[in-house]
A protein has these predicted regions:
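Hydrophobic/aromatic residue at the end of a short beta strand that borders the catalytic acidic motif
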Residues: 10, 29, 33-39, 110, ...
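A recurrent flexible, glycine/aromatic-enriched loop bordering the glycosyltransferase active site
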Residues: 69, 82, 89-110, 127, ...
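Short aromatic/hydrophobic "clamp" motif used to bind/position activated sugar donors
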Residues: 26
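Active-site donor/metal-binding and catalytic loop motifs
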Residues: 141-166, 176, 180
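Glycine-rich, basic loop-to-helix element that forms the pyrophosphate-binding segment
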Residues: 3-21, 31, 42
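Conserved donor NDP-sugar-binding/catalytic core segment of glycosyltransferases
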Residues: 33-77
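A short, conserved alpha-helix in the catalytic core of glycosyltransferases
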Residues: 101-152
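Non-catalytic, C-terminal membrane-associated alpha-helical segments of glycosyltransferases
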Residues: 190-271
C-alpha cells in the first residue's frame, strides 16, 4: 500500500503506483467498481494479443442497473466531446472486441513500458479527461487502445466526486478539454477543427447554464486558455502524419457515433 501526504488527484496518484510497479502491465480500477471473477484474466489475455496495444478498456456495466451499459471504451469527437461508448444502452450488446479512442481508466489495463515513451498521466489535469489524453498520445505514437467485452466490471459512477454534475467536475473538465486539444493537436489540426470545437463548447456552455453550472464551465475554459501554455505539448513528427490523419478520421466517425447512440437512447426513452 502506498500512502500520499497530499491529494494529488487521480493523475498524480496513479502515476505513483505505475512508477512503483515492476510488472509489464498495470491495471487501474476505481474504488466504486466490482469486477467479475474473470476480469483480470481477460484483460491480460486482451493486452497480450499484440505489442502495439497500449491499453484495454473493459465492459463497464451500471452497478444498480445491470441491464444497462456504463462504458464500452471512451471516444472523442470533432466537437471536442469525450464520451462513453454505449452508455445507457443494453448491456446485452457490445459483445465484440474493437479499437476505441481511449480506455476508460476506471477499469483498464496498460502496457507499462509505453508510458516511458509517451509520458504518464498528465498531472496538470488532476482529474477528468486524463485517460483520453494519455490514450490520444498513444494513438499519435502509433499504438492502439482496444475494448474487451469479456472483461466485465460493475460501476457505480461518480463514487468519489459524489454526483454526475457539480461545480468542481464541470470546471475541471472544461479546463482539461482545453489542455487536451492544445497538447495533442498540431497547429494545422487545431486550425481545421477550431469551428467544430467552438460549436461544441457553445453547446456545452448552454447545457451547463441550463443546469446552473454555466459560470463554472466558463471559469474552467478561461483557466484552460490562461494555463495551457504550461502543458507539455506533443511535438509534431513527420513520421506520425499518417497517425494524425487516422485520428482525424476517428474524430469524424466518433462524432457520427455520438449522435447515432444519442438518437437511439432518445428513442428507447420514448418506448
Amino acid at each position: 500500500t502506498i500512502f500520499l501526504d497530499t491529494n494529488t488527484g487521480f493523475s498524480g496518484a496513479v502515476n505513483v503506483g505505475i512508477r512503483a510497479a515492476k510488472t509489464p502491465y498495470v491495471l487501474l480500477l476505481n474504488n466504486d467498481t466490482e469486477p467479475d471473477c474473470h476480469f483480470i484474466g481477460e484483460m491480460v489475455k486482451a493486452i497480450e494479443r499484440s505489442p502495439k496495444i497500449f491499453s484495454v478498456s473493459s465492459k463497464m456495466i451500471q452497478m444498480y442497473h445491470k441491464d444497462k451499459m456504463d462504458d464500452a471504451g471512451d471516444m472523442y469527437s470533432l466537437l471536442g466531446w469525450a464520451y462513453q461508448r454505449g452508455v445507457g444502452r443494453s448491456s446485452g450488446g457490445y459483445s465484440h472486441p474493437c479499437r476505441v479512442f481511449s480506455a476508460c481508466a476506471g477499469a483498464a489495463i496498460y502496457r507499462r513500458e509505453i508510458f516511458e515513451k509517451i509520458g504518464y498521466f498528465d498531472e496538470m489535469h488532476f482529474a477528468y479527461l486524463e485517460d483520453i489524453d494519455v490514450g490520444y498520445r498513444a494513438r499519435i505514437a502509433g499504438y492502439d487502445n482496444v475494448y474487451c467485452p469479456h472483461a466485465v466490471v460493475y460501476h457505480v459512477g461518480s463514487g468519489t466526486s459524489g454526483s454526475k454534475y457539480n461545480s468542481f467536475k464541470v470546471r475541471l473538465a472544461a479546463r482539461n478539454n482545453i489542455y487536451l486539444n492544445y497538447k495533442n493537436m498540431p497547429f494545422l489540426q487545431l486550425l481545421v477543427n477550431v469551428l467544430p470545437i467552438g460549436a461544441g463548447m457553445t453547446v456545452k456552455y448552454l447545457f451547463f447554464k441550463k443546469r446552473g453550472f454555466g459560470a463554472d464551465y466558463l471559469a474552467g475554459v478561461k483557466e484552460g486558455l490562461a494555463t495551457a501554455g504550461k502543458c507539455k505539448k506533443v511535438g509534431y513528427r513527420p513520421e506520425h502524419l499518417k497517425n494524425y490523419l487516422a485520428i482525424e478520421w476517428e474524430l469524424f466517425t466518433g462524432t457520427l457515433l455520438y449522435f447515432y447512440e444519442f438518437s437511439l437512447r432518445q428513442l428507447e426513452k420514448r418506448k
